Structures are given as structure tokens and as C-alpha cells.
Amino acid sequence: MDIERPAAYVRNRALKTGSSMSRSIPIPLRTRLLVGGSLALAIANAFAVDATPPSVGAWQFLRPHFYGDRELGEVDESFMHVEAPGSTPDPAATPVALHFGKEAVGKIKQVRVVIDNNPSPVVATLDIGAGQPIAEIDFRVRVDRATAVRAIAETTDGKLEMRSAWVRAEGGCSSPPNASGEGKIGDVRFRPSEDGTSLQVSVRHPNYSGFQIDPKTGDAIPPHYVSHMQLTTGGKPLLDIESGISISENPTFRIVSAQPIATPVTLEASDSKDAHFSATWNGAADRAVAANGTR
């Protein structure tokens, strides 16, 4: 797992910006906050990676909501495992990596990431393009307190498999925002590997959680976050991401593929204020990005 913090962003054209958002929390987010906020359950002080967590926190409510009574398997790490630090020095930017083994590559169609004890426990839903040989997905999250971080994968044959990791943290969802997230919203950076098998995509955005305080006014900062990112490669779906406030500011996703990632790669993104952003990367040799958001 090696997510680099974006040092600079590419100026990108905002395609569409909606009207000012009401200070109220959108209904889907409000539902998630109520699920997480109603819980006052403690987690034992055990932080082994890929352990089976107890049925505590939001998971006991989320499991039947998303999966009903479907059987949920506990695969070993040769199929999938979750990598996260047992104790994070920065709870507002905790690295998480989802690793998929050879048996899983090309056979997982969706992964839902859940942080049990976050106020918004559903971190992201990741839909992998059909046939895409994705072997790893890395990103950074906010962690509000000691919790299980879960990845629930649905395979192409309809099976559900889960792995998890323990993380000790405190206050990630209310940590003060950094100035780096308050620049030109929607600026995009692509960072490819030399061999073309991995690509990091970053969007400049504050991703306000709704639990942060404006240091100048003392008022709560309303939630404002990237809600959807769609990546296509060579005109085919690569990864579709639905996300919320548990993703760290300046949302960054790194994709590792078992094969070189075809170009061009296009990102279409939108946020909770209905702003839309688009940018395209045309290949490793093409390093510069024009002001219109096309690489």
C-alpha cells in the first residue's frame, strides 16, 4: 500500500455547478448518520489484521439492510484481505488497501467498505468493471474511534465474502480541515506507475464531513463531499465509486491491475452540491494536463 499525498493538482474545468446547498444533511447521508450515531458500543482492544470482528457497531444493522439473509463467507487472505494500520497517527487520513488474490482477480464485481463505528459507516461502494483485472485498491479514510474496517465483496457468481482489519483511532471525522482541500475544487491529478499497471487518481476537494468546526467562526461546516467517481479505461468501465464523508479530503484512489491499464483513462466525478468534474489521462508519456481538464 503506497498512496502518495498529491503535491499538486491539475486545473480542471467544472462542467456544472448546482445552486447553493441547503444546510440540511441529504436524506441518504442523514440515514447513515443516524445508524452510526445511535450506537454506543465499545470494541475490544484487539487489533489483528484480518480478524473476524464481533457483531457490534453499525454492521449488525447494515448487514440485513444490504444483504438480507444471504450467506456471508469468511475467505482467507489468499482471496482478499484488508490492510490498515493497527493504530493510525492521522485518523483523518488513514490508509486502507484492499488486496485481491489471483483467485479473486476478475471475479469480484463489487466491494462495499464499512467502518463500523463511524457516524457514516458506509465508506464507499466500489463497482469493478466486468473483466477488469484489478488486484488492489488503495484509499484514505476518516476513522472516528476504535473500529473494524470491513470489505464485503460480491463475486460474479453471486457469492458474498468478507474480510476485516482493526484500527485504533480517535476523532477522524471531526478533525479540522487542511488548507490543501480548500483550493480549486475539482482539480484532478493522475499519477501512473512507470510500467502502467497502477494509477493513482486524486480530486482536490475538502470533503467536509459535517462534524468539523470552522476555526474562524466556530460554526459547524456543512457536509460537502465527493459522492460519485467513475473511471473508464479505453472506453470501458474500470471502477465506479459511490462515496461519502468517511473518505478523507482530497479523495485519492490508487488502482493496481494485473495488466497494464489501457488508455485513455477518463474520470467523471460529482459532489453533494451537484458540481461535476471531468478529466482524461492519455498515457504515461503524456505528463501535462491542459486547463480544460484533458490530459
What kind of region is each of these model predictions?
Residues 18, 36-37:
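Residue-identity detector for glycine
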